[in-house]
């Protein structure tokens, strides 16, 4: 599918931000789909490019872009999964190999790589920005009508797995965002009590 985003605002011009109540409706209903339920069709190349363009608009203190994207299309993802499976089985770890179903089954994935740089902007803030990229990418995919899930598993942290993905020593996987069409609508899960988690500060 070809997706046409609204024109990107021109640098230095005012950005009109009218209310979008439909966004509140979306957030009220937002629910991740289990990765193992995601099937074809998934986002095509034009849609993936648009999703990444949207995700790159997250808050980014210092304008450092302390993240990058690795697209795992069906061919690339299958090859990556095969190498991970060989790695796990070579270690005698069938449990780790079994966990690859979440990577194998969805049609497409995008790895969000945190690449924090030495800067006066604290490392924590740069990593938070990478997390915001994951969230925005997840939401944008769902707003486009796909199911999506933010996954981290052993292959997000394992040194050899990260090397297979092409990460530099200082880079970390903030998350794999897997996308596709859910076989069934996801069921609502229990949500936290936001009132109990909120306090009003007073001096």
Model-based region annotation:
Residues 55, 110, 116-164:
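Small-aliphatic-rich amphipathic alpha-helix that forms the alpha element of a beta-alpha
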């Amino acid at each position: 599918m070809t997706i046409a985003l609204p024109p990107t605002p021109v640098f230095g011009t005012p950005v009109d931000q009218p209310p979008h109540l439909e966004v509140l409706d979306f957030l009220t209903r937002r629910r991740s789909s289990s990765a193992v339920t995601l099937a074809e069709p998934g986002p095509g190349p034009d849609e993936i490019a648009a999703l990444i363009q949207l995700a790159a608009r997250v808050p980014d203190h210092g304008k450092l872009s302390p993240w990058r994207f690795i697209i795992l299309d069906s061919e690339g993802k299958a090859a990556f999964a095969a190498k991970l499976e060989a790695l796990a089985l070579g270690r005698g770890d069938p449990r780790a190999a079994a966990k690859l179903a979440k990577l194998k089954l969805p049609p497409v994935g995008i790895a969000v790589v945190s690449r924090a740089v030495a800067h006066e902007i604290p490392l924590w803030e740069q990593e938070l920005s990478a997390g915001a990229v994951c969230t925005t990418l997840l939401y944008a995919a769902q707003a486009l009508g796909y199911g999506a899930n933010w996954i981290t598993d052993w292959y997000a942290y394992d040194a050899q797995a990260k090397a297979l993905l092409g990460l530099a020593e200082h880079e970390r996987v903030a998350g794999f965002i897997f996308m596709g069409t859910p076989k069934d609508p996801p069921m609502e899960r229990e949500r936290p009590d936001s009132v109990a988690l909120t306090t009003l500060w007073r001096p």
